[in-house]
Regions:
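Alpha-helical segment of the N-proximal tetratricopeptide repeat
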Residues: 10-41, 56
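Leucine-rich solenoid repeat scaffolds
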Residues: 104-126
Length: 134
């Protein structure tokens, strides 16, 4: 799983350093472009970030459909933040119709990876997840 998640570290690390530089200097468009480059190569962490950029309009125009698309990719590729965010999108109807069954599914998936907010959400929704199952 870690290999799929991070892929070749040297490429990821190089891109991540550049992305961090752009973020710290508030060059958000370049930061978005760097994340998109990694997301298109299948890095779940970058996919999640691209979804967030589209959701919040950071370095790119807000687009709920694209936010949903990239967040869903991240979730399906095992990113726990992506899973939590996708659950939230289903719960709130962001880029997709409201679907509480799918929201619950993704909250559980994120909670199984010890995502604190997902664990709390599962408790709030009485999903029978009193503790993380990592």
């Amino acid at each position: 799983m870690a290999e799929t998640y991070y892929k070749p570290c040297s490429e990821f690390d190089r891109c991540n350093e550049l992305i961090e530089k752009y973020w710290n200097t508030k060059q958000f468009e370049k930061c978005f472009e760097g994340h998109m480059e990694l997301a298109e190569k299948g890095y779940p962490l970058a996919e999640c970030q691209v979804g967030y950029f589209f959701y919040d309009g950071i370095g790119v125009e807000k687009d709920a459909d694209k936010a949903f698309y990239w967040t869903q990719r991240a979730a399906e590729h095992g990113d726990r933040d992506g899973q939590f965010n996708l659950a939230y999108f289903y719960e709130e109807g962001i880029g997709t119709p409201v679907n509480m069954e799918k929201a619950k599914h993704w909250y559980k998936k994120a909670a199984e990876q010890n995502h604190d907010l997902a664990i709390q959400k599962c408790q709030d929704l009485n999903l029978g997840m009193n503790t993380a199952q990592g």
